[in-house]
Curated annotation (Swiss-Prot):
Keywords: Flavoprotein, FMN, Oxidoreductase, Pyridoxine biosynthesis. FMN binds at residues 61-66, 76-77, 82-83, 105, 140-141, 184, 194. It comes from Paraburkholderia phytofirmans (strain DSM 17436 / LMG 22146 / PsJN). Its EC number is 1.4.3.5. The gene is pdxH. Signal peptide: none annotated. This is Pyridoxine/pyridoxamine 5'-phosphate oxidase. SUPFAM superfamilies: FMN-binding split barrel (SSF50475).
């Protein structure tokens, strides 16, 4: 087995300075996200979502970002899943985007609110039919006896709703309302650039600070 201690990479693709970034972190995120798209990175919209349960035990998983604006970062899921239960108990979370090909990370922290039913309905209607049926078929994070049980449920839902399944009441969107957003750019010798946007509330101006790597 390869020695884990020997696996390392020196970062040298870019730099990050306060003078060069947008004062608005959402616009700065949009710039970096578009650069990730233009670089044809595989699934640049993937992010790690970290949540914490009522006992303080963390969990993390990869989800897809589905919207970003001045209100926050939006994703959709099953409200009865593990992450849904944890967000109900502790409505704070962290997101992490990692674009390794660009030697960049973006970390977002803040409180979680549900999107409106109208927003959830609109996004659900835009999904492929198979995904809409799957939202009904899967009791996400619950134990099942076999794969065939899931596939049987999928067929039953397909017969029940045809090509017009409604949005399940237990499925919808969340919006992370940021309190802090960090932009990280890899640099040589592990002396990375880290710029942190913070604000005291949603109506305050963003402040930018540099963090030691």
């Amino acid at each position: 087995m390869t020695s884990l201690a020997e696996l390392r990479k020196n970062y040298s693709l870019g730099s990050l300075d306060v003078a060069d970034i947008d004062r608005n972190p959402f616009r700065q995120f949009d710039t970096w996200f578009q650069q990730a798209v233009d670089a044809k990175l595989p699934e640049p919209n993937t992010m790690t979502l970290a949540t914490v349960d009522s006992r303080g035990r963390p969990s993390a998983r990869i989800v897809l970002i589905k919207g970003v604006d001045e209100r926050g970062f939006v994703f959709f899921t099953n409200y009865e899943s593990r992450k849904g239960r944890e967000l109900a108990a502790n409505p704070y979370a962290s997101l992490l985007f990692y674009w390794i090909e660009l030697e960049r990370q973006v970390r977002v922290e803040g409180r979680i609110v549900k999107t409106s039913a109208e927003e959830s309905d609109a996004y659900f209607a835009s999904r492929p039919l198979g995904s809409r049926i799957g939202a009904w078929a899967s009791n996400q994070s619950q134990l099942i006896e076999s794969r065939s049980q899931l596939e049987t449920r999928e067929r039953e839902i397909s017969l029940q709703y045809g090509d017009q399944p409604p949005r399940p009441p237990h499925w919808g969107g969340y919006r992370l309302v940021p309190e802090a957003i960090e932009f990280w750019q890899g640099r040589p010798s592990r002396l990375h650039d880290r710029l942190l946007y913070t604000r005291s509330d949603e109506h305050s101006d963003w402040q930018i600070s540099r963090l030691s790597p």
